[in-house]
Amino acid sequence: TDVVISPGSRNAPLSMAFHQASVKGLINLHIRIDERTAAFFALGIAKASGRPVPIVCTSGTAVANYHPAVLEASHTNIPLLVLTADRPASLRKTGANQTTEQARIFGKAVRYFADVSGSVYPMELPFNSLQSGPVHLNIQFEEPLVGDKSDNWLNDLTISAPKVFDRKAPGTFYTKSTRGVLAIGHDRGGLSAEAVKEFAEKLGWPVIAEDPLTFENATSHASVFLTSKTIADDL
């Protein structure tokens, strides 16, 4: 059985339980930070294997990122077990941070929904009577979310060496060019905004930025701007 988890705070009890199952060799545990990516990754596993794949996320807007994959699973009758962590019902509609209305958030796209508030929850229908497709269990957790503060779980982690990327320092790009333009993506190639700004000022080149708020006097929406044939010819 494969399980795909997107780490978070409220789903810590589920994450730790599945981690222990993984250590015992009972499941194949996959970690994906982005919930939308995680859901489609799980959808692919379920489609290839024909087995239900649980996806686990924290509360709030994280749940909404599952929606596209849940719809796809519904349309194609692919078994997907959506496990979403939630705050207790008493905190709903109180203005608590990130308290999204998660109950029935996927509407009719799921074959079954349960808002689980206790350790024992009677299912209204046997799962084997349901048509294949996504099932949503919204599980409420009260704090404390973690049972103890020991470091025993750290023994099961595999520590890998950090990846080192060789990034050229600003000032070494295109030094033989007298005219040019700097097209800056969201991550700026790993360089700081100050370094890019200094580099642009040194060369006297204009900046086209995907994130214009980071730079003063920058042309915004680089991906759209640079796909214009007229502008490309002018450049």
Residue ranges and their predicted role:
Residues 47, 59, 65, 184-235:
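Glycine-rich, anion-gripping cofactor-binding loops and their flanking helix/strand elements
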Residues 3-6, 81-85, 205-211:
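Short internal beta-strands
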Residues 10, 26-29, 125-177:
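Conformationally flexible catalytic loops at phosphate/diphosphate-handling active centers
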Residues 1, 45-50, 126-131, 170-180, ...:
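Glycine-rich phosphate/diphosphate-binding loops that line cofactor/substrate pockets in enzymes
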Residues 2-16:
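N-terminal glycine-rich anion-binding loops that anchor highly charged ligand groups
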Residues 51, 89, 97-133:
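Conserved thiamine diphosphate
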Residues 6-8, 116-118, 138-141, 183-189, ...:
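Structural motif
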Residues 12-89:
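Thiamine diphosphate
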